[in-house]
Amino acid sequence: MTFPIRRAWGPAAALIACALTLSACGDEDAADNSPTFVNTEARGTADPLYGKETTSAAPAVSSAPPAASSAPSSSTEPPAAAPSGDVQAVLDRIVAEHGDVGIAVSDGTTAIEAGRTAPEAAWSTSKVPVLIAANRTGAADGQLVSSAITYSDNEAAKAAWAALGEGAAAAQATQSVIAEGGDTATQVQSQVTRPEFTAFGQTMWGVANQAKFMAGVRCVEGAQPIIDAMGVADPAQAYGLRTLPGALMKGGWGPSLAGGYDVRQMGIVQLDGHDVAVALIASSPDGQYASAQSVRTSMAEALAQTETQWPSPAC
């Protein structure tokens, strides 16, 4: 069965309330929110999955043009893999320049990572495997996929999770997708661990394993509609990896247990004319969502301006 979801941005009063204070909002899994982006991931009542990651107010996006070409690679052969030390040095430099961040790239088999590499809450990036799993069962029509992936609508993602049976059944179906993509280590959370957020949004997913998954996702059965939706830009989320030409990506955001605000992105982007599977995590220096957006955009610019032989995705 399908769960058609109509984009409803919510009452104006709710948006204004969220815009006035971060504490009044939930979060991504709660509802991607912040004073700048009013997203249900930080809303509490809209868990990156209890509500809808609705955004308002334009995000801070750098005006500097990305160095990567927007044209797809014309090469029929993937570039030779760079010595891991070269790419490692690039990632280490980006981390050193941006503080409390993590980054990883992968070819699907191995990953090169730097900074915050321990598994942390996936927030709405977990919607990618959830929607792929739902699509496999025929429960995710085009409108549901677009709502949950392009616009990070939490209600749409919750509908997909429910269609999978919720709890252990949904977690197993979602985990099978992640494993098929190349990440056999991550365990999908089946139970709610933070009352204001969804179970799957609190899946502990490290940047290295996210990059591995993205390197193999195009070979995963039933993934294409979700990948297509990842390539459609939502103007309210135009920061970080989304600033790079042709990016296929999904973001997620929410409050950390330490009291900060985390923003995550994973995707396939073009660097130096070639596809690269990458995952990022950053915390805002002042606890504000908008600040974390700026950090993510700066990290993306640093990737685009670097010339090296990045690892090529397996798919």
Regions found by a protein language model. Give the residues of each.
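Conserved active-site loop region of the serine DD-peptidase/beta-lactamase
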Residues: 212-255
